[in-house]
Amino acid sequence: MDASVKTLNTEKAKALQAALAQIEKQFGKGTIMRLGEGEVIDDIEVVSTGSLGLDIALGVGGLPRGRVIEIYGPESSGKTTLTLQVIAEMQKLAGTCAFIDAEHALDSQYAQKLGVNLQELLISQPDTGEQALEIVDALVRSGSVDLIVVDSVAALTPKAELEGEMGDSLPGLQARLMSQALRKLTATIKKSNCMVIFINQIRMKIGVMFGSPETTTGGNALKFYASVRLDIRRIGSIKRGEEVIGNETKVKVVKNKVSPPFKTAEFDILFGEGVSREGEIIDLGVIAKVIDKSGAWYAYNGEKIGQGKDNSREFLRENPELAHEIENKIRESLGVALLPSIEIEVPKGTKQAAAGA
């Protein structure tokens, strides 16, 4: 009995090996592999979101490359700001980025303030949804673009809708367009290691009695094809006296195929500046017990940083070395990769000028 089972297993192994060889011959080497061979799952390449808290919540230190990402939320919640920060981070890694501005609403001056290099950014303002997705497909297939942002899915208007009358009913047209495009895109996105971020808006479903009435535009295809889905919300305002200077923002990782989902991150988005790095250092420092909070005062190593978050934020902005030191201590305690030495970041001319002065 044992001998016959062994013979059967040997025959099955030979048949499998022949099938694998045939598949590789027909479709190319690497088309099919065993998961345990090691060459299949490499370390996931990621790009920082520009927010330390969100990078930690994502579980892999940022957004994964070669994947589809969806970022959605209400109006003025920080969707475009977050994607512009991701573009800035990708450009720091010498990556090529493209922005498909279907809404025709990109503020180039604001993008520049967030650290985006406009000279290197590719931008397209397509007329129709089909044109926008054809451009995305061409850029992905080129293999030379590292990040593409589509702003937004709701603005990808099908050609038939644009050419029709104002009152025409064309149900499911945009959903079919997105479904077809994502079927074509997914495989090439993985091969080219290009990250595609779709910004999406929220709509309300009518007549929903139980559960959330909120839904995103463009049908269900994007929900399935996206490896990461981020729900971004404004939860409060940041004031300096009576003046509102920014928004308190909460991001929930609704879906995550590369790490456990449902984690959240909270950070400040300051108008004209983007995600407040110093604000995050203070908040995460208190959580990690690197910074002590007593009443309204914040202290580090027994020395007071400032009274109130706004003053503490300004102090850290004026003392980048200290901010760098605190951030690395936070990263160490939370098990995230440390930042490089600050000497690398500060230009040499600055030190010489300071010494000469």
Swiss-Prot record:
One Pfam assignment: RecA_C
Compartments, as annotated in UniProt: Cytoplasm
Keyword presence, Nucleotide-binding: yes
A single cellular component GO annotation: cytosol
Keyword Kinase in annotation: no
Domain of life: Bacteria
Residues that bind ATP: G73, P74, E75, S76, S77, G78, K79, T80
InterPro entries, alphabetized: AAA+_ATPase, DNA_recomb/repair_RecA, DNA_recomb/repair_RecA_CS, P-loop_NTPase, RecA-like_C, RecA-like_N, RecA_ATP-bd, RecA_C_sf
Molecular-function GO terms, alphabetical: ATP binding; ATP hydrolysis activity; ATP-dependent DNA damage sensor activity; damaged DNA binding; single-stranded DNA binding
GO biological processes: DNA recombination; DNA repair; SOS response
Protein role: Can catalyze the hydrolysis of ATP in the presence of single-stranded DNA, the ATP-dependent uptake of single-stranded DNA by duplex DNA, and the ATP-dependent hybridization of homologous single-stranded DNAs. It interacts with LexA causing its activation and leading to its autocatalytic cleavage.
Protein name listed in UniProt: Protein RecA
Species name: Methylibium petroleiphilum (strain ATCC BAA-1232 / LMG 22953 / PM1)
Gene of this entry: recA
